[in-house]
């Protein structure tokens, strides 16, 4: 047990005491990082199921010395390297932005207050914490009073009061008040060390695209080994092919089943979006939050700092009793704000207006709470002064307050009571007397109206959730061009059941407690919405944590920045549309080009099934060997799955995201995959009956496979633009340039289309083009 420090002699540790503790390892070095480590990045890009299966296939090809067919593995290595480089670049940018945003802990050492990083704290350090700060280590209160939000640790939204000698847990946040505290545990000894890691880092986000691809990979991963064995035995034993040919043909089928291209492109696109947003001063703390943004159809806004500038100013002070004129009111407010530890924007505005000589010494105080909507202070020679929302402190409505609210102002009442201040059970006294009204203005953010209109035009639903009076919020919303400004509710007057019932239809929620903010988000999510929440205060933390995606302003409380998915470093609400649409660009473009990649997965699976089935028929001449070799697939991929889709992912595409990504992509790819299967069966049967050589059959199939792939690229390039046409020309010319080059033909085991195969190619492609147009039109109608 640490000996409790004498609070009357708070000098902090000396430098020699600090060094002693550092030598003993009593340092708070257990820190959660919002950034992935370099090793995690390497591991994520190298040690994957895709790479493991590809590596196994490469080993088999190397064993039979099929060196030319190992080109695919060079592409796999390059893809892994590219993924590592891109992630490292994104990590560097995130780390750099996080460094600029890093919060310091005010620490007392040798009687001087200094700012330290959380990991520099040692056991017994004395730290100063204020509202909005996250507690970096378990600490005992030496001086002061605070209300602590322990929701990150316990899941309970109720605030916990902390007084002298109380223990505060790391990972929790100060919702109100200010304290001096002594570090009680450091590093891994902290009670909440693991929970702190979870609270400080961003909540994991499920990527629907990656989840779909994982399902596909899981399926192929289960069948690839038995399929591989069956195909190898078929070629080697039943067909009597040499070991090398058997391994090469079997490997091609297995490689084709792996949807590695689309997985790589998804990660690359998301990381590119992280970098692009970083250049726009938007800190993305979780890569997959970009995808979640794309699916957002309900954006919940905290009024202060988003629609408004968050720059409060006291407009008027209106005395409500003849016993206290403006001068008397000013003395009370000056004393109140001089003693108050409240640092929210409203308190700062009042403090700026009423600064001067203190007339009343403080006996005790109760910080402002976003749950109560008021704070209080017992002043010597005066009584207990209350400052907060009129409807929370007064029984009767004040007409002047209503008028100010309708002007869009924030209204506070200054009230007085002769009852003692009760910290343990804060409640409104029975003898409370209203002294004055304070009208506080918060200017509307420039461009907010255009931003709201634009979001609405893009099918993004909007809700305003605020702790302010709903009449004030409605008035501000009207000035900001919010269409549903008349749809509002006072949440202080309804219970949870009523709030749940109104959450979907109501547009503006006023006098919302932190618990109610969270409940609104939960209700919207249960209704099927993908939610995003913007905020900047400690009272927003529960809702931000609950939302599918959280967006906060850099000027907001440190606590919100630490748990947010995205941080607007410019603190500009007008950046929100661009962030949403960057996510849409990535997801829509991936969904748009996914069929190009899935064609190979489908036809490889179908052909493998047909090959295995043909072996069961019992006649050697009917046995079908997988018709392609890895080098052929790799070469076609460079011009079909490689450059064109990569370029297309950068195009702007802000339409709402479609659901059922994998199902729709598979259906769009199916006609082309069936064309490939038909081509193989027809050319094998017809070519054999015509006495074609294996090279002629292989050449025709190579051109048909590439051409069917190019049709999908053409569909992805519709409607045509100059840039897209040039992209198509480059791909086709590149393909022909390699296919007609003699040395490459030798590697590919093909030749040139002959007088026999060229007419068949032309006729089949004519039929395929007609079928492709018809199926594409049918899919568009659906």
Can you say where each PLM-predicted feature lies in the sequence?
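Transmembrane helix-loop-helix hairpins at the membrane interface
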Residues: 27-104, 350
């Amino acid at each position: 047990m640490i000996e409790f420090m004498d609070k009357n002699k708070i000098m902090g540790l000396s430098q020699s005491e600090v060094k002693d503790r550092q030598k003993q390892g009593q340092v708070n070095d257990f820190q959660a990082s919002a950034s992935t480590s370099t090793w995690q990045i390497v591991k994520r890009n190298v040690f994957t199921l895709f790479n493991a299966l590809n590596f196994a296939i490469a080993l088999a090809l190397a064993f039979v010395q099929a060196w030319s067919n190992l080109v695919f593995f060079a592409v796999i290595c390059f893809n892994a390297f590219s993924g590592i480089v891109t992630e490292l670049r994104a990590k560097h940018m995130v780390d750099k932005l996080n460094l600029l945003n890093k919060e310091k802990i005010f620490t007392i050492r040798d009687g001087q207050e200094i700012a330290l990083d959380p990991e520099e704290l040692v056991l017994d350090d004395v730290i100063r914490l204020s509202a909005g700060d996250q507690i970096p280590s378990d600490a005992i209160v030496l001086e002061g009073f605070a209300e602590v939000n322990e929701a990150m640790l316990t899941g309970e939204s109720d605030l916990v009061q902390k007084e002298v000698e109380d223990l505060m847990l790391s990972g929790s946040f100060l919702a109100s008040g200010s304290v001096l505290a002594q570090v009680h545990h450091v590093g891994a000894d902290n009670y909440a060390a693991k929970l702190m890691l979870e609270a400080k880092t961003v909540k994991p986000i499920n990527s629907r695209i990656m989840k779909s691809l994982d399902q596909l990979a899981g399926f192929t991963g289960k069948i690839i080994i038995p399929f591989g064995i069956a195909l190898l035995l078929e070629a080697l034993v039943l067909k009597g092919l040499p070991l090398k040919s058997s391994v090469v043909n079997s490997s091609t089928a297995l490689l084709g089943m792996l949807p590695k291209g689309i997985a790589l492109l998804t990660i690359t696109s998301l990381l590119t979006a992280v970098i692009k947003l970083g250049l726009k001063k938007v800190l993305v703390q979780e890569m997959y939050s970009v995808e979640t943004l794309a699916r957002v159809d309900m954006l919940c806004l905290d009024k202060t700092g988003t629609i408004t500038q968050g720059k409060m100013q006291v407009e008027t002070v209106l005395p409500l009793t003849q016993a206290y004129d403006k001068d008397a009111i000013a003395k009370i407010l000056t004393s109140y704000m001089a003693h108050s530890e409240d640092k929210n924007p409203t308190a700062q505005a009042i403090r700026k207006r009423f600064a001067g000589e203190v007339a009343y010494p403080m006996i005790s105080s109760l910080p402002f709470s976003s749950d109560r909507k008021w704070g209080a202070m017992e002043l010597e020679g005066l009584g207990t002064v209350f400052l907060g929302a009129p409807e929370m402190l007064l029984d009767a409505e004040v007409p002047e307050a209503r008028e100010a609210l309708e002007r869009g102002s924030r209204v506070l009442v200054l009230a007085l009571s002769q009852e003692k201040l009760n910290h343990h059970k804060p409640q409104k006294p029975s003898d409370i007397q209203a002294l004055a009204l304070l009208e506080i203005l918060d200017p509307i953010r420039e461009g907010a109206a255009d931003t709201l209109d634009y979001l609405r035009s893009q099918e993004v639903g909007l809700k305003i959730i605020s702790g302010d009076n709903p009449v004030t919020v409605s008035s501000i919303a009207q000035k900001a061009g919010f269409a549903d400004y008349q749809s509002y509710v006072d949440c202080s007057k309804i219970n949870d059941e009523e709030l749940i019932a109104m959450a979907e239809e109501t547009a503006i929620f006023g006098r919302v407690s932190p618990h109610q903010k969270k409940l609104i988000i939960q209700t919207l999510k249960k209704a099927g919405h993908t939610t995003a929440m913007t905020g900047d205060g400690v009272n927003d933390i529960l809702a931000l944590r609950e939302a599918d995606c959280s967006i906060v302003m850099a000027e907001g409380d440190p606590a919100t920045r630490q748990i947010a998915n995205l941080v607007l470093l410019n603190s500009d609400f007008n950046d929100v549309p661009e962030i949403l649409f960057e996510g849409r660009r990535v997801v829509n473009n991936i969904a748009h080009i996914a069929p190009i990649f899935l064609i190979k997965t489908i036809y490889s699976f179908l052909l493998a099934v047909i090959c295995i089935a043909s072996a069961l028929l019992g006649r050697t001449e009917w046995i079908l060997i997988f018709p392609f070799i890895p080098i052929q697939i790799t070469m076609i991929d460079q011009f079909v799955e490689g450059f064109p889709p990569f370029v297309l992912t950068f195009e702007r595409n802000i339409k709402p995201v479609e659901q059922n990504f994998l199902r729709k992509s598979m259906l769009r790819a199916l006609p082309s995959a069936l064309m490939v299967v038909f081509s193989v069966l027809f050319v094998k049967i017809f070519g054999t009956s015509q006495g074609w050589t294996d090279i002629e059959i292989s050449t025709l199939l190579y051109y048909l496979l590439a051409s069917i792939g190019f049709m999908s690229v053409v569909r992805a390039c519709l409607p045509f633009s100059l840039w897209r046409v040039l992209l198509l020309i480059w791909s086709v010319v590149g393909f022909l340039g390699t296919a007609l080059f003699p040395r490459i033909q030798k590697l590919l085991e093909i030749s040139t289309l002959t007088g026999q195969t060229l007419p068949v190619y032309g006729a089949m492609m004519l039929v395929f083009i007609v079928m492709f147009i018809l199926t594409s039109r049918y899919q568009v109608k659906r």
